[in-house]
Amino acid sequence: MRNPLMQPWLTEKSTGLTEQKGQYVFKVKSAANKTEIKAAVEAKFGVDVASVRTVNCLGKTKRQFTRKGVLAGKKNDWKKAFITLKEGQAIDYYSGSTDQGEEKKSNKG
C-alpha cells in the first residue's frame, strides 16, 4: 500500500489526547495494518513511533423519506489510528500537509 494515511483526525477529544498523552489520531485506509501505518508516520513526519492502536468505525445507516417510499443507504466504513510517539517528540500537522500539497500542485502544472 502506498500511503495509508488519509488525514489527521482533529476533534476536541483527539486534541486533548495530543496535549495530555502525546497521542495523535489519523484517519487511515481500511486495508492498512499497524506496521504500514507506523512506517508511513515515521517516513512522513520524521518521528519515532512507540505504538499504534487502530479502531474500525462502522458507517452510519441513513434513511430518506420521499414520496416514493423510504430510501435506505449506508455511509462507508473507515479506520482510525491512534499513534503514540516516543517521549519528547511531536508532530506538526501543518508542515506535513504543506509538503504533500506542494507535490500535488507541481504534478498538475
Curated annotation (Swiss-Prot):
Record keywords, A-Z: Ribonucleoprotein, Ribosomal protein, RNA-binding, rRNA-binding
Protein name: Large ribosomal subunit protein uL23
Family note: Belongs to the universal ribosomal protein uL23 family.
HAMAP family tied to this protein: Ribosomal_uL23_B
Subunit structure, as described in the record: Part of the 50S ribosomal subunit. Contacts protein L29, and trigger factor when it is bound to the ribosome.
Family matches, as PANTHER family: 60S RIBOSOMAL PROTEIN L23A (PTHR11620)
Keyword Ribosomal protein included in the entry's annotation: yes
Gene3D superfamilies per the UniProt record, alphabetical: 3.30.70.330
Domain of life, source organism: Bacteria
SUPFAM superfamilies, A to Z: Ribosomal proteins S24e, L23 and L15e
Gene: rplW
InterPro entries to which the protein is assigned, alphabetical: Nucleotide-bd_a/b_plait_sf, Ribosomal_uL23-like, Ribosomal_uL23/eL15/eS24_sf
A Pfam family of this chain: Ribosomal_L23
GO MF terms held by the record: rRNA binding; structural constituent of ribosome
GO CC field: ribonucleoprotein complex; ribosome
